[in-house]
């Protein structure tokens, strides 16, 4: 299942009283913009009970062009990683166990 921003806004409208559809869309956009800008400034994000978004620098490494077999360098870059909290992992595992 994919959960879109529009679906998140719909959930907010359904579960929070006095929130309009437009307000919910703006809240969702502001939430993700805050995550984007915080990561762009080089900071990590920790959401209690959910997980951590971290920045990791990956060094340059050798790669290979699959068509030609030619060796090409893969440039150094910064990537975002997500590590789920123990609480989230436990909830997922509990749900998985109930489904089996």
From Swiss-Prot:
**What biological processes does GO assign it?**
DNA recombination; positive regulation of metabolic process; regulation of DNA-templated transcription; regulation of translation
Its Gene Ontology molecular function terms? DNA binding; structural constituent of chromatin
Sequence segments annotated as region (Disordered):
53-72
A Gene Ontology cellular component where this protein is annotated is:
cytosol
Keyword Lipoprotein among UniProt keywords: no
Keyword Transcription regulation applies: yes
Q: Which keywords does this chain's UniProt record carry?
A: DNA recombination, DNA-binding, Transcription, Transcription regulation, Translation regulation
Please name the InterPro entries in this protein's record. Answer: Hist_DNA-bd, Histone-like_DNA-bd_CS, IHF-like_DNA-bd_dom_sf, IHF_alpha
Tell me the PANTHER family matching this sequence: DNA-BINDING PROTEIN HU, INTEGRATION HOST FACTOR SUBUNIT ALPHA
Which HAMAP family does the entry link to? Answer: IHF_alpha
Subunit info here reads:
Heterodimer of an alpha and a beta chain.
Q: Its family?
A: Belongs to the bacterial histone-like protein family.
- Job of this protein: This protein is one of the two subunits of integration host factor, a specific DNA-binding protein that functions in genetic recombination as well as in transcriptional and translational control.
- Protein name, UniProt field: Integration host factor subunit alpha
